Amino acid sequence: MNQIKELIMKLSHVFLSLLLTSGLNLAYATTLAATNTAAPQATAADYKPVQGQAGKDVIWIPTPEGLIDKMLSTAKVSSQDKVFDLGAGDGIIAITAARKYGAQSVGIEFNPDMAQFARRKVAEAGVADKVKIITGDIFQEDFSSATVVTLYLMPQLNLKLRPILLNMKPGTRVVSHAFNMGDWEPDERIADQHARAYFWVVPAQIEGAWVVSGLDGGPMRLNLSQSYQQIGGTLSRGGQSFAL
């Protein structure tokens, strides 16, 4: 009988300990939940980008304002242009193109918080009538209406964009901060202190065989080869051929 009483007492102590422990844990969890509920929650209006932060296949580093001016002036941006900035970040290139050069501008930015931040900057700059910020993927959005394309991406993204850019309307101007387009040689290199950029004009595709008729002495035949903006080939007329 005594052994049974001792066993009951031990079980009672164990049960009481478990109950007290559970009560403490419950109280702690309740307090923690209350604390978390009381903590202020960050909103989209509080978002501020941090230099070097990771994005989709890129990191965000703002383009220096001095280089932005040189990029846009090299591209001869005017009020007649529509500028698309691919990977718009804080929107500064699109804003500058509108505010200083009078262009209509569109920025495409993948990060929704960054895109909203750029929209606030657009409003603060007073150019909401000229600048639109799109939340989207540069490989999904249509920017074929651009007369000028600006970008600050990564080398592999430039190469992925290259065939898209080359299929744009001949004469479209392209300016890239920091990175080139592989073996598509730039028409001009831009430097500003420690920063650099590259400028291209999308060439017309004229490779192939051409015949020019209506000339004295008979037709002239052109067989043209093309590598980006570099043109070669032969000119044939009257049984003679000349290298171009």
Which residues fall in each region the model found?
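Conserved class I S-adenosyl-L-methionine
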Residues: 79-89
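C-terminal substrate-binding/active-site "lid" region of AdoMet-derived donor-dependent transferases
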Residues: 158-207
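A short SAM/SAH-binding and catalytic strip from SAM-dependent methyltransferases
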Residues: 143-160, 166
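Conserved SAM-binding motif I beta-strand of class I
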Residues: 104-109
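Glycine-rich SAM-binding Motif I of class I
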Residues: 91-95
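Central antiparallel beta-sheet cores of small beta-barrel/beta-sandwich binding domains
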Residues: 206-244
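S-adenosyl-L-methionine
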Residues: 30-80, 115-145
